[in-house]
Amino acid sequence: MAAEGPMGGSPPSRSKRADAQRNRETVLTAAAEVFVTSGVDAPIRQIAARAGVGMATIYRHFPTRADLVTAVYEHQIEACAEAGPSLLAGADSPFDALRQWIDLFVDFLVTKHGLADALQSDSDRFAALHAYFLDRLLPVCTQLLDAAVAAGDIRPGTQPYELTRGIGNLCVGRDNDPRYDPRRLIALLLQGLERPRTP
């Protein structure tokens, strides 16, 4: 028999927990969008307005701005990590899956680059976030590379860390130079990985 509270009421229902989780997801999505357009120093009220929630809801889930920035960054990492297996299952070839995943990875890097910068003053938090980034995304990149090699789509020998680090370096500076499009160079990089087809 379920335990009752001191006033004879029931414990918090699953629907309330589900509502809280939905609110959290809504806030994270809204914050990510606001951070892209207005930067990580955007007013919390702007994020609340975008999410359609009160500021108290945001502070209940994320007591400090650093908590919110970290959660947004982790949320985007998770989305990128979870996309890998789905792309591999649905793409025409493992190389196509790799290429599509790298497109998502570049989207993440280009639009969320300032989030990591905002946390560098908190060295412990930044180090933990960077470790989380590597722990979640390197295995996905490894899976995609291994599948593409096994299918004969790309040459063997490419290390996941080298590839993600190289792509990350190509994306640096995009925020400050609208004339620079890292995707063109990344497309050339991927062409270099592709194994030539025999006639």
Task: Go through each PLM region and give its residues.
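Basic, helix-initiating cap at the start of DNA-binding domains
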Residues: 1-41, 45-50, 67-70
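Hydrophobic/aromatic residues within well-ordered alpha-helical segments
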Residues: 23, 76, 80, 94, ...
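Helix-turn-helix/winged-helix DNA-binding modules
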Residues: 39-40, 60, 155
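Short hydrophobic/aromatic patch on the recognition helix
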Residues: 52-62
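Short amphipathic alpha-helical segment with a characteristic S/N-K-E followed by hydrophobic residues
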Residues: 64-69, 80
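Hydrophobic alpha-helical connector segments
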Residues: 71, 82-111, 126
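Amphipathic alpha-helical packing segments from all-alpha helical-bundle domains
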Residues: 78, 111, 125-153, 158-180, ...
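Short linear capping/connector segments at secondary-structure termini
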Residues: 118-126
